[in-house]
Amino acid sequence: MSELNKLAAGEWYQFKAAEVAAQKARAAKLCQEFNQIDATNPDAQTAKIQEILGSYGRNLSVQAGFNCDNGRNIHVGDNFLSNYNLTILDIAPVHIGDNVMIGPNVDIYTVNHPLMASGRRANLAQGHPVTIGHDVWIGGRAVITPGVTIGNNVVIAAGAVVTHDMPDNTLVAGVPAKVIRQLE
């Protein structure tokens, strides 16, 4: 089984394998091109980010400083807005719903590495999808970890580290993040 097939199946794979590295190199090149586009040319920015993403809805707005591992695994809905320096390590799929706003310096991770040093020395990794619902606001410097599902109408406070699923209609904060209160 190829390393990309292992990755797609959610199995441990060699993250330094040539086929995996080629995906990352493609994404790195496209992200570099996107990040060099003049901010006064939003049409060029939109065209380049559309080339990077797997799928996207209407009214897409992504600020410079965007980085990803693959790009094709990122799927965003309508009215998506991200501020500066969004990093999405999309080894596994990342699905983001409609009307989502992401603050500056947010990190979304789908990749995990072994706890045992022997597995890390063997360059092993494993992907776990991330799903973000509709009408979500993610505050600046928040971190979303592998395998997390965030419900609809959720506000994630700045600096939160989300390590487990979050239900609909909640305000989430802290390290690790927890539900602070219900939203109406």
Label each region the model flagged:
Residues 1-59, 177-180:
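Terminal amphipathic alpha-helical/low-complexity segments used for targeting or macromolecular assembly
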Residues 153-165:
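C-terminal/domain-terminus segments
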Residues 39, 66-76, 81-149, 175-176, ...:
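Flexible, glycine/small-residue-enriched loop-and-beta-strand segment within the central core
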Residues 166-168, 173-176:
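Acidic, glycine-centered active-site loop in nucleotide-sugar glycosyltransferases
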Residues 137, 155, 171-173:
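Short-chain dehydrogenase/reductase
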